[in-house]
């Protein structure tokens, strides 16, 4: 009687909460739905905490995520230590086997929307460990201060300071790294920071040792247009919805919600910055297969006041796609991973187009059945496939 009805109601509500329609080509769809339910629960708890006024949204997400952190434990193959590079906390992974030659170096930057995450998260620790062991590479996995306590450009500056420290001759010698074989890599917001610091490094006369490669894994690269085909198609897709991505972007610059509201409406860029739109105009930068009948809408200009208060969203250090062609020409060998079911897909695809137009050698790996964060979910077949291709590129190019 009543128990059956209650069970039925709970079952229906549970299915409604967990279930989201997914495309046919997604491998292991139920696994993705469970991960998404976990993410939904995290964000709903954070929204509830914010509603109660007990804590702000991002700090709650950060706190709940921190339970996935692991200590810096060495194993039979890799020595793991924590130290600081120029006052920035980093984890260093050094293979234990003897090497007759200098090793390659990889500087890794974690994702998490500039607001959450750390090198200590189990997924990042495992990735760094596997990279060091399988490729015989010294991996430096950096931390950086996070929003909402710290806004742009603090995240960029922390990462840049740590990278510059790693690229010092004496530091590379200490870790047995070949100065001609160092790459930078990052996923999501970490991919954003990797592209940004790689751009800055080219212009920096103080840095004598330059990067050999940059590898960007589903990176966030522009703040100008939140109405790209990938944002339209994947607005409600699991892991990273459009509204959550906009929240992360806006939080990078300020906790003032008026920027978030303007970005959601795609009405945040002032008319005096209209010249920047040519760098993110998807109608000319996306290959046909990514346009799929979408019509380009000329952006509606926003308030000059917002841009005056929070100029970061128009800064090339926050949005690497805003670099002009001359800046892009000096780039190292580049690898870009994009995923079909990801709001950030078109950021990466447009960057590939612009780098190639500037004469940079780029390998673009587009995952037709991929979704945002695939590499971080170690149990997924898609994640293993992405990792395998990423490792192959690093092995051949760093």
From Swiss-Prot:
Keywords: Disulfide bond, Endoplasmic reticulum, Glycoprotein, Hydrolase, Lipid metabolism, Membrane, Microsome, Signal-anchor, Transmembrane, Transmembrane helix. The active site is at residues 188, 342, 372. It comes from the Eukaryota. SUPFAM superfamilies: alpha/beta-Hydrolases. Its EC number is 3.1.1.3. The chain crosses the membrane at residues 5-22. This is Arylacetamide deacetylase. It comes from Oryctolagus cuniculus (Rabbit).
């Amino acid at each position: 009687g009543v128990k059956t009805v209650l069970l039925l109601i709970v079952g229906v509500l549970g299915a409604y909460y967990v279930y989201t329609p997914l495309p046919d080509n997604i491998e292991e769809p139920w696994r993705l739905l469970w991960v998404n339910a976990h993410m939904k629960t995290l964000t709903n708890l954070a929204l509830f905490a914010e509603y109660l006024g007990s804590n702000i949204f991002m700090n709650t997400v950060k706190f709940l995520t921190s339970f996935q952190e692991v200590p810096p434990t060495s194993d039979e193959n890799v020595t793991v230590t924590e130290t600081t590079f120029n006052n920035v906390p980093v984890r260093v992974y050094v293979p234990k086997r003897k090497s007759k030659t200098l090793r390659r170096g990889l500087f890794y930057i974690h994702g998490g929307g500039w607001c959450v995450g750390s090198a200590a998260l189990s997924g990042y620790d495992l990735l760094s460990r596997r990279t060091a062991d399988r490729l015989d590479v010294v991996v430096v996995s950096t931390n950086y201060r996070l929003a909402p306590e710290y806004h742009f450009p603090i995240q960029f500056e922390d990462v840049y300071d740590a990278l510059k420290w790693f690229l010092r001759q004496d530091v590379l010698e200490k870790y047995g790294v070949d100065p001609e074989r160092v790459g930078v890599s990052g996923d999501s917001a970490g991919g954003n920071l990797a592209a940004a610091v790689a751009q800055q490094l080219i212009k920096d006369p103080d840095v004598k040792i330059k990067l050999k490669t940059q590898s960007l894994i589903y990176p966030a690269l522009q703040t100008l247009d939140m109405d790209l085909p990938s944002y339209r198609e994947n607005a409600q897709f699991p892991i990273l919805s459009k509204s959550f991505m906009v929240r992360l972007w806006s939080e990078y610059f300020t906790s003032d919600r008026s920027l978030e509201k303007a970005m959601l409406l795609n009405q945040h860029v002032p008319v005096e910055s209209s010249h920047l739109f040519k760098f993110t105009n998807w109608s000319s930068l996306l290959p046909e297969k990514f346009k799929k009948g979408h019509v380009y809408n000329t952006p509606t200009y926003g308030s000059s006041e917002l841009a005056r208060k929070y100029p970061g969203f128009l800064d090339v250090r926050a949005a690497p796609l805003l670099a002009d062609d001359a800046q892009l020409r000096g780039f190292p060998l580049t690898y870009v991973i994009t995923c079909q079911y990801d709001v950030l897909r078109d950021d990466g695809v447009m960057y590939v187009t612009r780098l190639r137009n500037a004469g940079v050698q780029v390998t673009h790996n587009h995952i037709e059945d991929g979704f945002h964060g695939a590499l971080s979910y170690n149990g997924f077949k898609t994640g293993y496939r992405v990792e395998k291709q990423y490792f192959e590129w690093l092995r051949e190019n760093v």
